[in-house]
Structure formats: C-alpha cells, structure tokens
Amino acid sequence: RAAQVIAARLKSTDATVTRRGRSLGFSGGVTRHEKDLLGERQIPDAALYGVQTLRALENFPITGVSLRDFPELIIALAQVKEAAALSNTQLGLLDQKLGDVIVRACHEIEAGRHHEHFLVDMVQGGAGTSSNMNANEVIANRALELLGEPRGTYAVVSPNDHVNQSQSTND
C-alpha cells in the first residue's frame, strides 16, 4: 500500500510549480542560469537555493513535507556551517572575508530568516545530501548578496568549496 501511495505522489507531483499548495517560486519571472555536472538550469532569481536543490525537488518529491517545516533542523544545519566556517577561518583554510560573510549568513538563518528557501523533501535519497546542499546553496547565495554579488556567482562563494569546506557532502 505504501508503495502505491508513493508511486501516485511521484506521478502527480510537479515539483516545479507547487507542493501542498505552496509555491516553490517557479511561477515565472526573472531567472538566473546555474550549471552543474548534469548541465545548465534556470533558477528563479529571487531564490537563495541553487541547481542542486532544484534537482532534489525534481528527483525526490516524495512526501510533500519540506525542510522548511522543521525550523529547528534548519537552525542546526546553519550552526554546523557556522562552526565549520569559523574553524576553517581560524586554521587559515578559508579567507577571513569569506568566513565572516558565511558566518553572517548563518546568523541570519539561525535568527529565523530565509527558511522559506529550504525546500527539499524530508524523505530523499542520498543520506541527507540534498538537505546539506540546500543549506550550502542558501548560505552561499546569501553570503554573495551580503558581498554585493549576484546569486549564483559561485566562483566568489561556493556552496561546495567554501560553505561545505572540511565536511563531507552529507554531513
């Protein structure tokens, strides 16, 4: 019975429009292009998440219950990213300016801001990789904004190389 319910959800869910009556920010408007190893995709320009989160939304629309429904978990993720940025900065692995701006972005998330950009489904493949990447992208894009850079300019602040530095993909 559970397999039938999941299969029905997968067939009927359009992760690019709405989930449980809530818009995911894909209803038109200005977009930006982001590229990963699978190719280039358009992301709503107002979104703090990026291409990895978009792919997770498309690949794992399982329950309709998203990360944003669990603010304590979002705060905990931001605290882990903050601790990593502080440690990497102290060890000289991360530039002071980048470390500071990543910490500022984490503090905003810990204060309850930007939670609407944590969209991945709570049930997903990959041992939490999608949740981790959603957090990395939101933090990186907010850090870019704080630096006055456009979202998606990952050569400046990278979700993988800077926000996720010294962590595994699914920490």
Give short role names for the model-derived ranges:
Residues 8, 15-23:
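Intrinsically disordered or compositionally simple regulatory linkers and C-terminal tails
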Residues 24-170:
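Conserved, well-structured ligand/cofactor-binding cores
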Residues 1-10:
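Cyclic-nucleotide recognition modules
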Residues 13-15, 28:
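Low-complexity intrinsically disordered segments
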